[in-house]
Amino acid sequence: MKSCGSLLTPLYRLPSPLGPLLLAGRGGWLSGLWFEGERHCPMSHQAEARSQCLALEWDGAHAAVADLPPFVETTLQWLRAYFSGLLPLPPLPDLNLRGTPFQLAVWRELLDVPFATTLSYGALALRVAHRLQRPSVGVRAVAGAVGRNPVSILVPCHRIVGARGALGGYAGGVERKVALLAHEGKCADGRDVASSDWFFGCPPQ
């Protein structure tokens, strides 16, 4: 993961089982992945600009009509495996994230939270403090950085929960957080992942 020269303007729009996703990046580097309408997405409230994004197909049919950069293909491969419950997941695309040193430290720690597990904001704060070689960091500051994670799902901020298992917030909507955690639990248990399980309806066509 690197942290310079990020391209944060979404260029692609992809249907998913939990609603449309917006992708940003350049070359082999993914710099942004947001649910449409998500807080902190650079274009969440600019319908005209969003309409200019290149529409992608979930099944890869777009490949015949578009010369896509590598980050798009690797991101799609990962997302299709994730939502299909195909474990182990393929490698993540290379990430090029833009944020403060503190935010980057938080996002790096998010990458270490395993699939189908959760971690409290307080426990995450301890890990961030260790990474930054500080005695402590504020839990609220950590929560703020989690909320501004620019790569949903792949950088798994949905696995961070409140004290005593309370869900806490999620920039993409708490309903999606519930759905993602439930999905990962079923995959880890070896249960079949059916399209009807998805909170937001049918899988992408």
Q: What feature does the model see in each segment?
A:
Residues 152-169:
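Charged low-complexity interaction tracts in eukaryotic proteins
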Residues 145-147, 153-154:
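Major-groove DNA-recognition helix of helix-turn-helix-type DNA-binding domains
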Residues 146, 161, 171-176, 181:
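DPxDG-like acidic metal-binding loop motif
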Residues 129-144:
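Short, positively charged loop/turn segments that connect secondary-structure elements
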Residues 1-133, 183-205:
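Basic nucleic-acid-binding alpha-helical/helix-turn surface characteristic of O6-alkylguanine DNA
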Residues 165-171, 176, 189, 193-198:
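Charge-rich, low-complexity intrinsically disordered segments
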